[in-house]
Each structure stands twice: as C-alpha cells, then as structure tokens.
C-alpha cells in the first residue's frame, strides 16, 4: 500500500445564508451570472442573486416537488403531467420565458439537461434525447434486455459521446454510445476484465458543529475483493452491502466515470481512452 498523505482537511463554510418561507426542493447555480435557480416543495420555481438573496423572478408550477434541470440558459422541469416537461429559456439575467413543452408520450422516470439537450428515461424502458431549441427528438434507445428494464433507472447523464444510466442492483451501471445507440460497456464487463482497487479515508477530527463541507484526502490500498464477480454482493466494509447506484457522472477533465452508490464511490479511470481509442486500460477504484 502507498503511505497515507500528511493529514489535513479543507473546510468550506457558507459565505451567506438565505432564509425563505418555503422549503427548497431542487437548487441549481448559475455561477457565470451569479444567481441561483430553485424549486420549492410547494411548487414554485424562482431565481435569486447569490450575494444579496434578492428575488429576481418566479413562476408557480402546477404540482408540488418539481424536479429541476438548468444549463447554459435553458431550464427544464416537470409540470405535473407524467409524460411532459416544461422548457424555459433565459431572456436576461435570472429571468426566463417559456419556450415550449417536450411531450414524450411515455411516463417519465428521470430526466437530465446538458447544454441544449435533455435526456429522458421512461417507465417503459426507453431512453429518449431531445434538442430543447427545436423540441425535436434526436435519439431513441431501448433499454429492454439490459439491467435497466422494467423502469430500473435511478439516475441518467450524458455527454457528446455517451449516455450513462444507473439503477438499483449492484450491476446496474451502463454506458451507451450516442452515435450507435447501443450498449458500449456494462459494469459487469468492467468487473470481469479489469483489476480493482479500494480507497480508504484518513481519520478526521471531531466536527465542531458549524455547517460545512469537508474535502478529505484519500490514499489507495489494494484489496483482493472490493467489487465481487457477477451476481455476488460487493461490500465496502463488513456488514454493509451495496444495493443501488444513486448517480453517475462523466468527468471530462480527468477522463473518469464517477458513480455514487448507497455505500461508496466508484471511479472508472481512462474509460473514454479505452472505449473510443483503445489507448489505455481502465482502472476501477471503489471506496
């Protein structure tokens, strides 16, 4: 094992705290224009200045707990209809106008906005992509026969090359090619073909009670069993069994696919170099 690095913890304290008479449900930051987009549990979408908390704009939605996606001047949220998404476009700082609606024609399980494209997973095993500028469908992928059939989707993401799907169950992590619209790699394939490593955190001092985020240094140790072979439970530590993947995200700056489970984090390093060019062997790290 590599020796652990010298102990230190970076702490991020809130610069400001804003109180509201409504409970926030989903929050997205627009750092380039220094404001926050938020939905509330009561069904409101609003924007506010990040420094002063001044309310910039708001609109009421037809139902409680709306999910929100926001990126590059576009905003998408569910409007209460099981197969529809509302699309809004920013016309000036913090102010949006309705641009239309995406009507999938299938009950929506999850959706994710990246740039001007929204990815939708449906309860009847479809993965649909739309261009929010034209509201036109651009991709259709059938998830039947994969780990994600019967609506087994907990999170989705995408980039220029792939769609990423996470679900309940230890092997429910899938990479799908955007151009081919076919499965490019599954977690079962990764586990079967490549060695695994584990990460262990340093010990931390007792928290002081102030609200904060802590960025912890990690050091790698090799482990003979971190993710087990197919259809066996893999464990982070004795007695803790991984049950589902809660999120998946590609990090372009490091060519790493990051997946969050209910008991740990999985990194698949060099995954695009491997899938697109065959120029590197991927490394799996779980902690």
Residue spans for each PLM region:
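Conserved blade-register residue in beta-propeller folds
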Residues: 47, 87-89, 129, 173-175, ...
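Intrinsically disordered, low-complexity acidic/Ser/Thr/Pro-rich linker and tail segments
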Residues: 1-57, 64, 83-95, 181-238, ...
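Long, internal scaffold/assembly segments composed of regular secondary structure
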Residues: 104-205
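Repeated scaffold domains used in trafficking and secretory/extracellular systems
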Residues: 18-32, 58-73, 103-114, 143-161, ...
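Surface loops and adjacent helix of pleckstrin homology
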Residues: 50, 123, 132, 168, ...
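Loop/turn-rich, solvent-exposed surfaces of beta-rich toroidal or solenoidal domains
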Residues: 245-287
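Short beta-strand elements that form the blades of beta-propeller/WD-repeat-like
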Residues: 28-39, 66-81, 86, 110-121, ...
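Eukaryote-skewed repeat-based solenoidal scaffolds used as protein-protein interaction platforms
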Residues: 94-103
